[in-house]
């Protein structure tokens, strides 16, 4: 197998090489210990946009959660997610304090292996400044999108605010094999 040295040199923060797209499995931690702190875990009625994104009926509910991700106890990401209750009825705050996608794989027998992401940057807000220890003039990287189960079912809508030092995403495009 040929590995392009440009890939090795760039050192992208994300390395999607496992079975699912979860941060626990995908973030290149270089020996650092990942951590998750649940800041909020509720059941809510989704707004119209969230219903559309997750293919929900108006009567359906979602888990709404906010988690602070860290490496060696240094916060790098604020994650806000919404998961339909019907897809993971036993989801709990305890599970959310670990890996939700690994739980889906081991307990529900499904994989979260597809995503549509919008990647951008924006000025940090009060939450980012406080939780990610950012100064007034420091931005956050923003990744927002839908994660899908292996059968194409929308599983989670998520917004991830990353400390700018961890916001690096490399891509390789090859149109030769059409």
Specify the residue positions occupied by each region the protein language model found.
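HTH-adjacent hinge/linker in prokaryotic transcriptional regulators
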Residues: 1-53, 57-58, 88-98, 105-113, ...
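Hydrophobic residues in beta-strands and at strand termini
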Residues: 3-4, 83, 162
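Anionic-ligand binding region
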Residues: 67-72, 81-83
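C-terminal regulatory/effector modules of DNA-binding transcriptional regulators
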Residues: 49, 55, 71-74, 86-87, ...
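Residue-level recognition of beta-strand microenvironments
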Residues: 41-43, 68, 146
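A short beta-strand signature within small-molecule sensing/ligand-binding domains used
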Residues: 61-63
